[in-house]
Amino acid sequence: MENNAWKIIYLATIFSLVVLGLAYYLMSPRDPAHLLEEKTEKMAEFFGTRVEGRKDGRKLWEFNAEMGWTMKNQDASRLINVRSGRIYNKKGYLTVTNLTAPWAMVNPRTEIIEAFGQPEGERGKPSKLKALIDLGKLSSNNKQDWSTIIADHILYNSQHNFSEISGKSQLIKRDSRLFADAISVDHELKKAKLSGHLTLRRRDGLIRSAFGDYFGETERLELFGGVTFEAKEKGTKATTVRARRAVLFSDIDREIELSGGVEASQGKKLSLADNGVYSRRGKKLFLSGRTRTVIEKAQALIKPETAEKLRNQDVRQILRAKTLLTSDSIEFSTTSGNARAAGNVIVTQKGKEAKAETAYYDDQKELLTMRGAVQMKKGEDWLNCGKVTIYVSREVFEAEGMVEAKFKL
């Protein structure tokens, strides 16, 4: 009997312990799966310190971060709230500096370093990733010679010395700010390839294109794939130029070269040409190569189909109601809106026609004056004139000098 009593007590004790253990398990807080995973992946943690990575005696990177840890497999280290960072290429030269980011990941084995513009799980918020990047002028102490990068993500590959920058990327140089979806930088060539919704903001206007190449040593930017340049600056006439290709520089006082199906519009004037040069310093736009210019009356507006008709050489409808000027070249002032055409100048308007060496257009008076070997057509004959004045709004041709009498058409 006594043995049975002890057995009952023993079994009851075991049962009680099992129940208590189960209750403790069910009631005790448990770490979420991602925290358990995070704990198991950490080998070493550090807080508020400077950390660096080296390989074969050379420095790869150096960061000041609020905190971070090294993975147990030692393949990568994660850094949180990077206050400043430096990245070096395989030759030991500084490539990226002044880097700040919510977090970064470095992999010593692959020599790949990544920085991110938003904390994990907070995509879509404004990026806090910013850095100065080597694009040819990094040796200068003048910070204006450095290129500033703002983006959602930067990946730098030290072995191949290139960077991939993506997500609402910005490349800032002096007074210019270039926006793109993606920027690929070859640090060996000091060259950046840009793609996706390119927009360049400068003090003198706005430029858009599909693709572009930036050459850091010469600070030259080549844009292609539907280039549109809107020249807008205080004290100038709004001028829009479209072309297939454009070449420009970080120094906005240097000229912008445009080529391939150039189309320029300024107020009542629309021109098509093979090539163009825009000069901010000279306050002018120069077009050359088979230029065709339509000049409307003050109350009229340039319609989109007008450019298409000029491009297709379908000028019959234009000749009925507009003033058409063809020449070897034409130059527009971006301040007054006046224009000067030169070389094989021909002006037609409602059946009237005149030709000369040069023509000057006064935008305010809507007056076109032709000079130099001037000829005006009267019937089937061409009459030599000293000058022909064309009143665009009144649709009148007036010839004078070296003719039998002054006359109007």
Could you say what each language-model-derived stretch is?
Residues 1-409:
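Mature-chain termini and adjacent capping regions
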